[in-house]
UniProtKB/Swiss-Prot annotation:
Molecular function via GO: RNA binding; structural constituent of ribosome
Family of this protein: Belongs to the universal ribosomal protein uS9 family.
SUPFAM superfamilies: Ribosomal protein S5 domain 2-like
A Gene Ontology BP annotation from the UniProt entry: maturation of SSU-rRNA from tricistronic rRNA transcript (SSU-rRNA, 5.8S rRNA, LSU-rRNA)
PANTHER family for the chain: RIBOSOMAL PROTEIN S16 (PTHR21569:SF16), RIBOSOMAL PROTEIN S9 (PTHR21569)
Keywords on record: Cytoplasm, Ribonucleoprotein, Ribosomal protein
NCBIfam families: PRK00474.1
Any single Gene Ontology cellular-component annotation: cytosolic small ribosomal subunit
Native species: Candida albicans (strain SC5314 / ATCC MYA-2876) (Yeast)
Protein name: Small ribosomal subunit protein uS9
Length: 142
């Protein structure tokens, strides 16, 4: 017996989330704990975004397990939501039909492009002569 499953990943800065999407009964777990335990509440709503965008009917027969490592809390949440969104699209492409995949992609892209495409911005390294990458120490002429 082979189970229908796909594996996708989401990234934000140094945080990486790997999502395993398979046929099931609608469970969503992040690092082994339910999605309802994500703290603080504002970040929990960010994780819920891909789910609320497409409606809960698309999740009835799907289980999602997400493992996330690296980065801070906010980066991890953005990586999780990207992994979930990409996992849904991949699952619908592989096991449902092309039309529903295109519909999901269109919904996600119109709401927020980073749900499907990784944010390529990275931190610029600090240089000498100042406090940060671009900021310089104040200059005095006398």
């Amino acid at each position: 017996m082979s189970t229908q499953s796909v594996q996708t990943f989401g990234k934000k800065k140094t945080a990486t989330a790997v999502a395993h999407v398979k046929a099931g009964k609608g469970l969503i777990k992040i690092n082994g704990s339910p999605i309802t335990l994500v703290q603080p509440e504002i970040l929990r709503f960010k994780v819920y975004e891909p789910l609320t965008l497409v409606g809960l009917d698309k999740f009835q027969g799907i289980d999602i397990r997400v493992k996330v490592t690296g980065g801070g809390h906010v980066s991890q949440v953005y990586a999780i939501r990207q992994a979930i969104a990409k996992g849904l699209v991949a699952y619908h492409q592989k096991y449902v039909d092309e039309a529903s995949k295109n519909e999901l992609k269109k919904i996600f892209a119109s709401y927020d492009k980073t749900l499907l495409v990784a944010d390529s911005r990275r931190m610029e390294p600090k240089k000498f002569g100042g406090r940060g990458a671009r900021a310089r120490f104040q200059k005095s002429y006398r």
